Regions:
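Solvent-exposed soluble domains appended to multi-pass membrane proteins
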Residues: 1-7, 12-216
Length: 216
């Protein structure tokens, strides 16, 4: 099985100058990095445009090769293509229509994902409002978004259901902005040793970091 997880807004906050914590927010990920092949990635987009990262990851095509008028391929390009290519089709060619499946714990029409994933040849795009919809969709404390733990459970269900190899795509939602103070007993409020931030910036940072810790 090959599972590609695009973890919403994930980064290592300990690498940002001026940002520090008295405890490591992502110790498990750091430990895994130390014992296996790992590295750093420079994102081609910041502050929005999740679907553009998705498009580039699934197709291997950089937005830099397109004209500047192409802002969001998921909305402007893929719906108008006859046979758009994506990596999942390698599994489809070998195992048939159910060679690839996708999960996004939000709404299917966002960025026209329901149209695009069908064009790419995924057997389903399983969302909050799709048919079939995702089974696991609990949130954490006051967060409006499905937790990463629940999102992973949906992927595990697909792995256990299918006997042959498949390509599974997951785009998570837990750490999506805005970063309102929605986690109860957030230990990173006390562990935040960063300096020079406004009250709003501290709240955003500490909520975001708690989300990363939950992902970890």
């Amino acid at each position: 099985q090959v599972v590609m997880i695009l973890s919403e807004t994930f980064s290592d906050p300990t690498r940002i100058p001026g940002i520090s914590f008295s405890t490591d927010p992502i110790p498990n990920i750091h430990a895994i990095k130390d014992t296996t092949t790992s590295g750093l990635m420079l994102s081609s987009g910041y502050g929005g445009g999740t679907a553009n990262m998705e498009y580039q990851a699934l197709t291997g095509l950089s937005l830099s090769i397109f004209d500047d008028s192409l802002i969001i391929p998921f909305q402007q390009l893929v719906p108008n293509q006859k046979n758009p290519y994506a990596f999942n089709q390698i599994w489809n060619n070998r195992y048939g229509a159910d060679g690839s499946d996708a999960v996004h714990p939000y709404y299917q029409s966002m960025y026209l994902r329901n149209v695009d994933y069908k064009k790419f040849g995924f057997s389903h795009l399983r969302t909050l409002d799709s048919t079939p919809s995702i089974k696991h969709k609990d949130t954490i404390d006051y967060s409006p978004y499905v937790s990463d733990e629940e999102a992973y459970k949906n992927i595990i269900d697909l792995i256990e259901k299918q006997k042959h190899p498949q390509f599974l795509q997951l785009s998570t939602m837990q750490n999506h902005m805005p970063y309102t103070n929605w986690y109860i007993d957030n230990e990173f409020v006390g562990a935040d040793t960063s300096t020079g931030l406004s009250a709003d910036e501290y709240q955003n940072l500490e909520t975001y970091t708690k989300g990363l810790n939950l992902t970890d």
